[in-house]
Amino acid sequence: MRRPVVMGNWKLNGSKAMVTELLTGLNAELEGVEGVDVAVAPPALYIDLAERLIAEGGNKIILGAQNTDLNNSGAFTGDMSPEMLKDFGATHIIIGHSERREYHNESDEFIAKKFNFLKENGLTPVFCIGESEAQNEAGETEAVCARQINAVIDTYGVEALNGAIIAYEPIWAIGTGKAATAEDAQRIHASIRALIAAKDEAVAAQVIIQYGGSVKPENAEAYFSQPDIDGALVGGASLDAKSFAAIAKAAAAAKA
């Protein structure tokens, strides 16, 4: 059985005080919780502090990051490399988020290169895909997700997805309070897994597919009860220790 992964994407939120309070609280809330991997992706400036706080709490939390460059060193002002992330113990790296696609004009092909570079450096890509509201209303969701995934598969092979995490995040549900129903999310997750299975059933069987988009303690159980939803990529609710821990506990219970 696939082990669920619940990851918090803190986006552009944080301060020393907030990171300390949040991770201290999360360490306490996760005491004794088993059957789920819990990860956080703080802003880059707080990765060092997060690493220390996670260690103080007994390393119950996986450290991640929100981006990576395509180079490990050199004249690339403002960027951070996989080697730097590894230096701070970060392993799960978010790529392809709709905010990066929109605000930084990151293409499917560029994101596929990031995916491959993370794999080459021994890190776990958390590969975000998803459709806009207009694409959803036009019935294009499955085609959009397939295009985004195939950017990786067609260049690097389906085996590249081994050990990776896919996060399906309908753009219209991110930070809006709207959310896909559990049944609709399951339908898309099943189509993603079927797309991969058509090329390699073993890869499809092991790949983690998270749902993201206004996941909260109140709706988490419904999502995690679906057979192809293997966790969540959580935004706003991950900024509250009790809420985020409740989501993680729901994943552990549903997949036990």
UniProtKB/Swiss-Prot annotation:
The active site is at 97 (electrophile), 169 (proton acceptor). Its main location: cytoplasm. It is an enzyme of class 5 (isomerase). InterPro entries: Aldolase_TIM, TIM_sf, TrioseP_Isoase_bac/euk, Triosephosphate_isomerase, Triosephosphate_isomerase_AS. Its EC number is 5.3.1.1. Pathway: Carbohydrate biosynthesis; gluconeogenesis; Carbohydrate degradation; glycolysis; D-glyceraldehyde 3-phosphate from glycerone phosphate: step 1/1. This is Triosephosphate isomerase. It comes from Vibrio parahaemolyticus serotype O3:K6 (strain RIMD 2210633). The lineage of its organism: Bacteria, Pseudomonadati, Pseudomonadota, Gammaproteobacteria, Vibrionales. The gene is tpiA.
